Amino acid sequence: MTVKGLETHTPMMQQFLRIKAENPDTLLFYRMGDFYELFFDDAKRASQLLDITLTKRGSSNGQPIPMAGLPYHAVEGYLAKLVQQGVSVAICEQIGDPATSKGPVDRQVVRIVTPGTVSDEALLSERRDNLVAAIYQNSKGFGYATLDITSGRFMLSEPETEEAMQAELQRTSPAELLYPEDFTQMHIIEAIKGTRRRPVWEFDLDTARQQLTMQFGTRDLIGFGVEKTERGLSAAGCLLQYVKDTQRTALPHIRAITLDSKDHSVILDAATRRNLELTQNLSGGFDNTLASVLDHTATPMGSRLLKRWLHQPIRDTKQLNHRLDAIAAFKDTGMFIEVAEVLHHMGDLERILARLALRSARPRDLARMRSALQSLPQLADLLADIEQPRIGELAKYSAPMDELCELLERAIIENPPVIIRDGGVLAPGYNAELDEWRDLADGAKKFLDDLETREREQHGIDSLKVGFNQVHGFFIQISRGQSHLAPDHYVRRQTLKNAERYIIPELKEHEDKVLSSKSKALGLEKKLWEELFDQLLPHLERLQNAASALSELDVLANLAERADTLNYCRPELTDQTGIEIAAGRHPVVEQVLSEPFIANPTSLHHDRRMLIITGPNMGGKSTYMRQTALIALMAHVGSFVPAEAVKIGSLDRIFTRIGASDDLASGRSTFMVEMTETANILHNATSKSLVLMDEIGRGTSTYDGLSLAWASAEWLAEKISAMTLFATHYFELTELPSMMDGLANVHLDAVEHGDEIAFMHAVQEGAASKSYGLAVASLAGVPKAVIKRAKAKLTQLETTGHQQAIKNPSKAPREEQQLTLLPEPSDVEEALAKVNPDEMTPRQALDELYRLKALM
């Protein structure tokens, strides 16, 4: 619907269409009394998305106007549903007074709720960051900026390749993504729900610099270290303007922008984040992830920080040791228990402060802030007993703020209502004038009780009652049977079926006074509420620093608790390349097993750069590889790790090529996905990388797969010298350690008992003797007849060779042997190899010929 032809509509509908034209890409919630109404296509769309009734109102061009509505008091629930579906909503409120308005009451859009810019508690997942992001691209690479409006955290980066950009998108998982209308790499963002197409000019670099310096109150951006990041700044400028447009208010909590440099991080590509299941499992849930084991934080803001740490391990050994020292101090003193108990009272201070900055904080937000401030002295006392530099530094930032605490204690009642609209939030004694107006309003009940008693007794009307409603105000009600007793000065106001209602001058005078006092008390309370924000906002930076310190204290105390409870050890960080793990365990798998986890060692160093891992399917190869990567990652987060001892050098990247499935959306087969991930590793791994390669070459023919696996292993070992765990079912690869330096064979052990198999899950030196494939198939429930036939076919393949067995599928001996890719020599071939015809007599030669004939 356009704004053309407005004259054919009612004044109210004309107003709606004008406002809708200014907000074409959002659902417009148009306030009408106690409801938000939607019209035209918005109504149709909302009825489908929210499962609400679609009705009609008036007409347009002879056609009824579609309409849908929802009660204003239930709007949060509906907004939550829309935001989860990536839909933005413009909230249009009545700002004029209906009593004084000529025509439609004035309305305007007061805020735009979008998936990435919501700050309302009811619309957010408390333990996950909610980011709005912008992406930009030119010939040199990508620019990427993210903003968490609920904390003010503003970051930018400049990924150079498509793979790096995809990794950033997966790491940050934005709820909303802005992109320029000329963006060409749409396939990398199509999976994101809340994408927003923006004009190219919104990414203008000069405009971006101007926007950012204005926001931060600086002359330039040199102090933030982002002056030369032109691609990133283009994205950041568009992002900041979008947030300003949607919030319609100042953003004082966004005080800086930070360059997210990959030089200081252990880089994890998209496949690695997915395969290691850091915060999301392969099914898209949270269960059985690393975060599900490690996250026992006391506050939502601590939980979010821990997840950021897991997704961005760091290389700075000094910073890592600061974290490890703090965890050790909490663990050794046992203070993590008491600290966690105090932190539980802190709530989500970080997001409360964001709502304060946006002036959208609710009464219970400030009550929770008061509770947090009241807990700071107790926390300070606990931290004072721990002599550790990092904890001491954090304690300074989270020091008590007595003056702010006292202000909130004076201002807010103990249990305030949800919203300020109806008053009753500010405490008695906070403001003398407010107390006076409240006393006038509160005195109404006694006056009415006295009036009712007096009138009833004076006129002998026992059915007389004094009441009030919103339409008629105060009234005296007399039953129909006694209405003839009403005095002459009673003025009839309303007639009901069984009663009459009257007004008298004294009651009217009191009504005016009461309504006036209530109105003035409410108006004054709302004014004082806004002034309370003005008193708190100058302390915003200090409060944000405290929230940041409390978040880190929460994570460190939590990791100390996890280390103590789960028997983790402190990793030793060195400058030498290598990974030495004694009795390592998988942090997630050991928590879900009913029996004890079998711990295993890992040793990778200059003279042992690659482990060729063989063993039966289900024997634990993938678990062993993943646990090594997770232990390495946890060490680079600054956490204790599940092992008896760990010594690890600095890593630059962790790669995983584990498992694969079809990427139907991109038209890529399983094998194509596998080869793409392999190519990424071979191009980008270095001697400081940890590489996990699991079953390369499964998705193609046997010999193609073996060739690719062999060549990939050679390249990783010789050209890159990366620390590599290379699991394979190609036993031919176990020859590599005898042909090249720096490689070793290990295997996962298993024991067969007749037709049954027992997995030992223990890593042993040397190659596996067999694959146990048929035993695993039997364990999986494959029909016995199929297993029997497979054994026969296996024997034929071993005996006659691959091609001959295919040509004669029915001639299958029944002896059980182990399959290898390149068949071992047959008995005849081995016998012939030992024969020396020059040393044989004719009789011996004839006998040997008969013997060989018998072997066939």
From Swiss-Prot:
MF terms in GO: ATP binding; ATP-dependent DNA damage sensor activity; damaged DNA binding; mismatched DNA binding
InterPro entries recorded: DNA_mismatch_repair_MutS, DNA_mismatch_repair_MutS-lik_N, DNA_mismatch_repair_MutS/MSH, DNA_mismatch_repair_MutS_C, DNA_mismatch_repair_MutS_clamp, DNA_mismatch_repair_MutS_core, DNA_mismatch_repair_MutS_N, DNA_mismatch_repair_MutS_sf
One of the Pfam families matching this protein, by short name: MutS_III
Gene Ontology biological process terms, A to Z: mismatch repair
Coiled-coil ranges (or none): none
Chain segments carrying region Disordered: 798-817
UniProt name for this protein: DNA mismatch repair protein MutS
